[in-house]
């Protein structure tokens, strides 16, 4: 019977009925076995009573037996006969003599012919000599001999005296100290210095803190028979500690990934079954079964392809389309398939120095956990000794900053379109449980159809332990203590500048709100800031600067700042220096002003002011994106089909590698980072020497492969 199309309630009822039937069947079998056992016991007792009632014939001495059989042997020859029996390897002869029932032993205590009777039985049935005969040839004889040991045997065991099979002499056997049982029933005095040192040397327990004899003040206190010791991994060398930490993290990551993959696999199966149940009744059973079989083939294919290891040698670099302080973004083409990707490379050493370990892990988790059309798709991630690599989809339309530089100001209709799509994109990030914290025009990319997608989640957080910098500081305390102490100069202390990735200053621009030409110069300088770690604090919420508690509402502040720039032409808190920008953002009540020569609709101005306000009163704090969707500024927006409509700007490409919407010409004026050049030289040396790629502790588990992309035809 096919149970795939039953409801969960029907499956549960069917499962309960089956369990009840199995329990009833088990009880019947148990009752039958009990009745059979009782009958066997009654039959056995009846047989014993019948044997006791039958009269036993009188026993004859062995000498009479020999005379009746016409034998001339006499009793002194029995010593030789006994030696012959021993040479015939009769097993457990002496033990069988001791293993007689106690009542028979009492009957023949005063009868000298008891030994003769035993030998009579042996003489009547002499043993047959067999090749390779041994006591283990017939194990059932051992079972019969050892099933009912006598009291004498117990006494012998307590005295630790064992009889030899091949000789008549006994051996006094005492177990050595290493056989002493370390449990509650042990009589070993572990407080003894001799036994303590012996156990420590044999059990390899360094620095055991066994309490010495007489250490307790209470004379009536019972001595402990346990070994107490402290783990001291610091006594091991540095290499051993690093290997232990690496193995521990790899094991944790292995089981975490195994459980996560199993949950995802089961969820994909449930989603497909739910989809098939909701289809029209016209779908045939054969078609549904075929789809389930196809899913099984995809799962099997994914397990194989996921083990395929990628490296930098699998891609050809077409052009560098972005640079930053921690790496660069390249347009690459896969050698075997010819497909185009955007490869983001991050330098590991800079991740250490700039305290970006938590940020890069959060970015990878966001991209890997999202299948939303509003987020850039991550296909693969891998690493080598110097770099982390993110293989993402290539969006040829550039970013929103390029559009602002080209068009300067958007109309309200165009602004409404892009802001509505940004609302849906931010909502998708929040549903994943993440906060972006760095939404700006540079991170809003344009796809081939003109719609937006969010990227660059380097400052995002999901409030997981691996997204917290303190987690990596504790992890690296023993590996590189000088990397984790902000006071020694090797790692910059967290500050506004480092948190916003500021490292290269540009010329200050004396800004006047009426000078559009100078504003355009600021935009070009702003692009240079985007390539470096100078960053732009213009879009960051004030609660992030003051290290107060904040939530998802900080992303809505950034959206308000972007909307201000689209309608007016510059950010709301634009200043000559970043520090002046910080000051204006913190004092937003006084510095937020809309120029008099800019005419905005009441709806747009109201939305800007409700987004650029304190966190308690900010729009979207309590009900998220629904509060923004219901604002009058977005009246008429079809939120369900907005991605299907034509965008205001659709990039027209000349080829699949066309990058004219990226300011690649400006990248020639951006100097390469010395750290990047040094890392590339080190990587080339490692490859020439044939060195193995080594995973660092913070980057264990960084590798990723996407299911829906990897299971496509010719994905790899």
UniProtKB/Swiss-Prot annotation:
Does the UniProt entry include the keyword Cell membrane?
A: no
Disordered: region residues: 22-78, 128-154, 176-223
Residues bound to ATP are 321-329, 344
Among PROSITE patterns, the record links this protein to:
AGC_KINASE_CTER, PROTEIN_KINASE_ATP, PROTEIN_KINASE_DOM, PROTEIN_KINASE_ST
Q: Where is the AGC-kinase C-terminal domain?
A: 635-714
Could you tell me what reaction this enzyme catalyses?
L-seryl-[protein] + ATP = O-phospho-L-seryl-[protein] + ADP + H(+); L-threonyl-[protein] + ATP = O-phospho-L-threonyl-[protein] + ADP + H(+)
| Active site as annotated | 438 (proton acceptor)
Q: Which keywords annotate this record?
A: ATP-binding, Kinase, Nucleotide-binding, Phosphoprotein, Serine/threonine-protein kinase, Transferase
The UniProt entry, under InterPro entries, shows: AGC-kinase_C, Kinase-like_dom_sf, Prot_kinase_dom, Protein_kinase_ATP_BS, Rho-assoc_Ser/Thr_Kinase, Ser/Thr_kinase_AS
Q: The Protein kinase domain covers which part of the protein? A: 315-634
GO BP: budding cell apical bud growth; establishment or maintenance of actin cytoskeleton polarity; filamentous growth; regulation of fungal-type cell wall organization; regulation of protein secretion; septum digestion after cytokinesis
| Claim: Electron transport is one of the keywords in the record | no
Compositional bias ranges of the Polar residues kind: 62-78, 130-150, 180-195
SUPFAM superfamilies listed in its UniProt record: Protein kinase-like (PK-like)
Gene Ontology molecular function: ATP binding; identical protein binding; protein serine kinase activity; protein serine/threonine kinase activity
Q: Low complexity bias: where?
A: 22-54, 196-212
One of the record's GO cellular component terms: incipient cellular bud site
Pfam families according to UniProt: Pkinase (PF00069)
Q: For this protein, what is the EC number? A: 2.7.11.1
Similarity field: Belongs to the protein kinase superfamily. STE Ser/Thr protein kinase family. COT1 subfamily.
What this chain does, per the entry, is described as: Protein kinase that seems to play a role in the regulation of cell morphogenesis and proliferation.
Q: What is this protein called?
A: Serine/threonine-protein kinase CBK1
Native species of this protein? Debaryomyces hansenii (strain ATCC 36239 / CBS 767 / BCRC 21394 / JCM 1990 / NBRC 0083 / IGC 2968) (Yeast)
């Amino acid at each position: 019977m096919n149970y795939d199309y039953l409801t969960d309630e029907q499956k549960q009822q069917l499962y309960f009925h089956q369990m009840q039937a199995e329990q009833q069947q088990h009880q019947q079998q148990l009752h039958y076995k009990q009745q059979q056992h009782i009958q066997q016991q009654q039959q056995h007792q009846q047989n014993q009573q019948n044997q006791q009632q039958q009269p036993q014939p009188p026993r004859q001495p062995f000498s009479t037996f020999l005379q009746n059989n016409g034998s001339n042997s006499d009793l002194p020859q029995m010593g030789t006969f006994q030696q012959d029996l021993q040479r015939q390897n009769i097993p457990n002869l002496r033990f069988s003599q001791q293993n007689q029932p106690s009542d028979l032993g009492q009957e023949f205590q005063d009868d000298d012919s008891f030994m003769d009777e035993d030998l009579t039985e042996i003489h009547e049935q002499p043993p047959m000599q067999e090749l390779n005969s041994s006591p283990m040839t017939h194990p059932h004889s051992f079972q019969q001999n050892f099933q009912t040991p006598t009291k004498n045997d117990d006494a012998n065991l307590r005295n630790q005296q064992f009889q030899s099979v091949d000789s008549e002499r006994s051996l006094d056997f005492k177990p050595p100290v290493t056989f002493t049982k370390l449990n509650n029933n042990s009589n070993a005095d572990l407080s003894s210095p001799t036994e303590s040192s012996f156990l420590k040397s044999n059990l390899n327990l360094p620095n055991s803190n066994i309490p010495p004899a007489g250490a307790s003040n209470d004379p009536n206190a019972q001595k402990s028979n346990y070994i107490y010791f402290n783990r001291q991994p610091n006594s091991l060398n540095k290499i051993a500690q690093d290997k232990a930490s690496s193995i521990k993290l790899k094991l944790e990551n292995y089981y975490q990934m195994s459980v996560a993959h199993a949950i995802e696999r089961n969820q994909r199966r449930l989603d497909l079954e739910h989809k098939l149940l909701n289809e029209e009744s016209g779908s045939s059973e054969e078609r549904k079964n075929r789809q389930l079989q196809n899913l099984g083939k995809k799962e099997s294919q994914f397990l194989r392809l996921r083990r395929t290891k990628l490296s930098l040698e699998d891609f050809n670099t077409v052009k560098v389309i972005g640079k930053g302080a921690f790496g660069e973004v390249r347009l690459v083409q896969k050698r075997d398939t010819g497909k185009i990707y955007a490869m983001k490379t991050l330098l590991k050493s800079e991740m250490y120095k700039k305290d970006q370990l938590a940020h890069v892990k959060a970015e990878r988790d966001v991209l890997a956990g999202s299948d939303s059309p509003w987020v850039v798709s991550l296909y693969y991630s891998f690493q080598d000794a110097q770099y982390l690599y993110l293989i993402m989809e290539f969006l040829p339309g550039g970013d929103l900053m390029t559009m602002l530089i080209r068009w300067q100001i958007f109309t309200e209709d165009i602004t409404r379109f892009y802001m509505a799509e940004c609302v849906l994109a931010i909502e998708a990030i929040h549903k994943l449980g993440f906060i972006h914290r760095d939404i700006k025009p540079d991170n809003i990319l344009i796809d081939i159809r003109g719609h937006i997608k969010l990227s660059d989640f380097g400052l995002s957080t999901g409030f997981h332990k691996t997204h917290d910098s303190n987690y990596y500081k504790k992890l690296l305390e023993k590996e590189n203590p000088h990397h984790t102490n902000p006071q020694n100069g090797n790692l910059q202390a967290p500050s506004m500048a480092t948190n916003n990735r500021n490292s290269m200053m540009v010329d200050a621009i004396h800004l006047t709100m009426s000078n559009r030409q100078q504003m355009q110069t600021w935009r070009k300088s702003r692009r240079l800031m985007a390539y470096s770690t100078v960053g732009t604090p213009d879009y960051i919420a004030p609660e992030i600067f003051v290290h107060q508690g904040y939530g998802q509402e900080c992303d809505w502040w950034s959206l308000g700042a972007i909307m201000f720039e689209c309608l007016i032409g510059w950010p709301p808190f634009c200043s000559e220096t970043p520090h002046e920008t910080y000051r204006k953002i913190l004092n937003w009540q006084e510095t937020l002003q809309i120029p008099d020569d800019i005419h905005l609709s009441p709806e747009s101005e109201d939305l800007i002011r409700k987004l650029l306000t304190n966190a308690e009163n900010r729009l979207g704090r309590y009900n998220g994106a629904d509060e923004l969707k219901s604002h009058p500024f977005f009246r008429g927006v079809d939120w369900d089909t907005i991605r299907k409509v034509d965008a205001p700007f659709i990039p027209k490409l000349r080829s699949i590698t066309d990058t004219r919407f990226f300011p690649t010409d400006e990248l020639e004026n951006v100097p390469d980072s010395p750290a990047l050049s040094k890392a590339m030289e080190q990587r080339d040396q490692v490859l020439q020497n044939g060195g193995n790629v080594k995973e660092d502790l913070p980057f264990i588990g960084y590798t990723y492969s996407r299911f829906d992309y990897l299971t496509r035809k010719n994905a790899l």
